[in-house]
């Protein structure tokens, strides 16, 4: 019976094994045939895949309102709906709006847009927008939350790119393939390789036992990030099957994946895996490191020579044939003390050794092509390799045949003026960063599941204008901020509020909340505590080391007075203030921050350590002038915080409140 049972069981196992192979073959056949059946031509009819056009300015009735071309497109839609634009905002309100838009800080007396964009704070403000999109973080997250101790160099690269108004098409190319570009000099080379941190910053399962799966997961994350960031397409959806909505077959996904398979992102895939980093040190810094290594090596020789001498003397004195397993147990106190002194010197030299600057980034590997993996399973590869190529919905280019990865060709294709998506996607992002909602509300998805543009002609006009003006973000900002559309008040007419409650037609300026970073920075600025040093890092974690200790406690501190941009962004454990005020998930692309209203926000603004520290500093400033009356002090405080004098009622209530603390003015204020 046992033998019969075994045979039945074995027969069942073999049948299931055969069925599994048949199933895999059928799935593979279906996947390959489906890839050929997707109608790329029909899919190209989607609005986002149409070539850019430059529509004529609409004819409007109210010819005195438009200040620049933007206003014609907005006003035409308003007039079509029977609505009128809101009146212009007063200068004080407009100044506040513009300063937060360009600098992320409370307004000063500067009114010139060009001068505001020439401040170093401009690059810091706009870099943070881009860092949302590229899922910037100072740690890996996921299973092994290792420190990205050199990620800050990419962050500083982005700050410098916005401050220098690097053309956006060049900005894109450098992030995808900076290491493949010809550098003007050594400084420029370091900048270019640092830019490729864009591809390396994503979260990775560093302890994944299946190395092929780990690599394909990393490639998938790169494709997903690249697609959403620059093209507004969810390319990653085609990994396991043809895209359910957009005309992107699985074959196109693996053709693109071959480019990143040919790119070296990781130094090692062994547990725990380590990402690749590019050297960004100067010849002088290299010599400093070599000198440190020489001193360390020399000290090790001193220790070895002294230990050998002591051991030889030990053999002679003790008349031993050989040393015991632990000869140090036989050392005298004086010998032990001398060895400890030598080892302390070694530790000091090692701790003071010059660390060579490195930057997260990628480099080219061996040119490789991939087959389709059925359902994304690398254990079920098709026999046919997919030549490296760009998505066919947007390109009729021939497959890549060179010995390089193809990243440079990919970057040039993405930034080609004939590509209908790249310029549309970035001008839409800039619009969203100013108005709180993009002309296409789904900023990261221009595919069939994304929303249609509210003002399609304006979107195309801006995209064409942007390209013709050298892909300049600063020029685009100036165009938008100079428009009558941007300068309206935020309260509309009763009719507009009723017929356009969501303000999709932009009959009024949108009400905008301060994000977490400008909120924090403003508190420090008003308290006179903000450290405006630009660039560098404040984090002290060693590269690749876990940011959590053995008790799962994160020792990261956020007490610095530097701008919020420079505070560590820890995946799986975002700073409380950031999290409280809707900081995006740093593990995914996010070009569209959300707004929430929750009780802890009010509690934070009442009694958090940051609030107590900054209000105490402001109080000391107010009380320092003994000549001021309570009324004058209240007026000064209002102007400092709100950039306006208090109303009569506000003044009356504030004076009455602080008057109750005559014996303890510090507490009252």
Model-flagged regions — what are they?
Residues 17-25:
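Sec-dependent signal peptide recognition
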Residues 26-35:
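Hydrophobic h-region of N-terminal signal peptides that target proteins for export
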Residues 34, 59, 214-226, 330-333, ...:
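Electrostatic cytochrome c docking/interface patches
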Residues 35-57, 128, 148, 161-218, ...:
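Post-cleavage N-terminal segment of exported redox proteins
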Residues 62-97, 101-122, 129, 135-184, ...:
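Primarily short, surface-exposed interaction patches in extracytoplasmic proteins
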Residues 181-290, 578, 590, 612:
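Sequence context surrounding c-type heme c attachment/ligation sites in exported
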């Amino acid at each position: 019976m046992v033998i019969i049972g075994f045979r039945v069981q074995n027969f069942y196992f073999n049948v299931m094994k055969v069925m599994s192979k048949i199933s895999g073959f059928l799935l593979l056949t279906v996947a390959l045939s489906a890839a050929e059946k997707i109608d790329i031509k029909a899919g190209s009819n989607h609005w986002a895949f149409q070539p850019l056009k430059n529509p004529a300015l609409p004819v409007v009735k109210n010819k005195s309102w438009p200040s620049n071309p933007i206003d014609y497109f907005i006003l035409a839609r308003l007039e079509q709906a029977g609505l009128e634009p809101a009146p212009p905002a007063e200068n004080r309100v407009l100044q506040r709006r513009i300063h937060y838009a360009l600098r992320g800080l409370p307004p000063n007396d500067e009114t010139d847009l060009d001068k505001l964009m020439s401040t170093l704070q401009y690059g810091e403000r706009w870099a943070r927008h881009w860092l949302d999109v590229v899922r910037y973080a100072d740690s890996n997250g996921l299973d092994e939350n290792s420190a990205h101790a050199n990620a800050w160099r990419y962050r500083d690269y982005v700050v410098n790119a916005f401050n220098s108004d690097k053309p956006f098409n060049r900005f894109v190319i450098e992030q995808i393939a900076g290491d493949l570009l010809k550098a003007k000099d050594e400084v420029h080379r370091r900048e270019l390789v640092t830019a490729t941190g864009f591809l390396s910053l994503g979260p990775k399962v560093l302890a994944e036992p299946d190395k092929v799966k780990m690599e394909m997961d990393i490639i998938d994350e790169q494709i997903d990030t690249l697609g959403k960031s620059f093209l507004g397409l969810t390319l990653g959806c085609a990994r396991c099957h043809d895209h359910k909505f957009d005309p992107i077959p699985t074959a196109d996904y693996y053709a693109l994946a071959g480019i990143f398979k040919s790119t070296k992102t990781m130094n090692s895939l062994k547990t725990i895996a380590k990402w690749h980093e590019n050297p960004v040190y100067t010849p002088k810094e290299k010599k400093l490191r070599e000198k440190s290594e020489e001193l360390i090596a020399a000290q090790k020789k001193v220790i070895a020579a002294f230990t050998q001498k002591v051991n030889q003397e030990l053999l002679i004195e003790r008349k031993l044939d050989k040393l015991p397993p632990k000869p140090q147990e036989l050392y005298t106190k004086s010998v032990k003390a001398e060895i400890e002194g030598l080892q302390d010197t070694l530790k000091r030299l090692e701790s003071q050794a010059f660390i060579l600057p490195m930057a997260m980034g990628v480099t080219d590997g061996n040119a490789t092509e991939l087959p389709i993996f059925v359902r994304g399973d690398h254990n079920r590869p098709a026999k046919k390799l997919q030549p490296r190529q760009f998505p066919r919905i947007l390109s009729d280019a021939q497959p890549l045949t060179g010995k390089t990865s193809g990243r440079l060709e990919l970057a040039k294709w993405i930034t080609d003026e004939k590509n209908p998506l790249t310029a549309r996607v970035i001008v839409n992002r800039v619009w969203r960063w100013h108005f709180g909602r993009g002309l296409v509300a789904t900023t990261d998805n221009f595919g069939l599941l994304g929303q249609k543009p509210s003002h399609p002609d304006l979107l195309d006009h801006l995209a064409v204008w942007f390209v013709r003006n050298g892909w300049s973000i600063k020029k685009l900002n100036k165009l938008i901020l100079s428009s009558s559309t941007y300068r309206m008040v935020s309260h509309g007419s009763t009719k507009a509020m009723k017929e356009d409650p969501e303000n999709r037609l932009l009959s009024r300026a949108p009400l905008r909340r301060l994000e977490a970073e400008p909120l924090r920075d403003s508190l420090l600025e008003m308290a006179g505590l903000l450290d405006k040093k630009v660039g560098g890092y404040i984090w002290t974690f060693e590269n690749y080391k876990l940011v959590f200790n053995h008790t799962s406690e994160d020792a990261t501190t956020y007490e610095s007075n530097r701008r919020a941009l420079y505070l560590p962004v820890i995946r799986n454990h975002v700073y409380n203030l950031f999290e409280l005020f809707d900081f995006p998930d740093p593990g995914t692309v996010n070009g569209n921050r959300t707004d929430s209203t929750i009780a802890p926000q009010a509690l934070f603004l009442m009694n958090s350590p940051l609030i107590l520290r900054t209000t105490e500093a402001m109080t000391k400033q107010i009380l320092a002038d003994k000549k001021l009356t309570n009324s004058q002090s209240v007026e000064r405080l209002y102007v400092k915080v709100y950039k306006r004098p208090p109303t009569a009622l506000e003044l009356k209530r504030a004076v009455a409140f602080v008057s109750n603390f005559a014996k303890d003015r510090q507490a009252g204020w």
